[in-house]
Amino acid sequence: MAWTKPIIREIECGMEINMYGPENEDRHDDRDDLF
């Protein structure tokens, strides 16, 4: 099976990466973080 070059498509996405962070800046070490 030959390797084929993947097609790169740029898509519009309304979500930003900062949505997945904490809602406020008050961070606690005892809380489970996403990363």
From Swiss-Prot:
Instruction: Cross-link Pyrroloquinoline quinone (Glu-Tyr): give the residues.
Output: 16-20
| Function comment | Required for coenzyme pyrroloquinoline quinone (PQQ) biosynthesis. PQQ is probably formed by cross-linking a specific glutamate to a specific tyrosine residue and excising these residues from the peptide.
Q: Which family does it belong to?
A: Belongs to the PqqA family.
**Is Transcription regulation among the key words of this record?**
no
User: Domain of life here?
Assistant: Bacteria
- Hey, which pathway is this one from? Cofactor biosynthesis; pyrroloquinoline quinone biosynthesis
Tell me the organism's taxonomic lineage.
Bacteria, Pseudomonadati, Pseudomonadota, Alphaproteobacteria, Rhodobacterales
UniProt keywords (A-Z) are: PQQ biosynthesis
Q: Name one Pfam family in it.
A: PqqA
Q: Which range is the signal sequence, renumbered to this chain?
A: none
Determine if Nucleus is one of this entry's keywords: no
Q: What is this protein called?
A: Coenzyme PQQ synthesis protein A
Source organism per entry reads Roseobacter denitrificans (strain ATCC 33942 / OCh 114) (Erythrobacter sp. (strain OCh 114))
Give me the gene this protein comes from: pqqA
Q: Which GO terms describe its biological process?
A: pyrroloquinoline quinone biosynthetic process
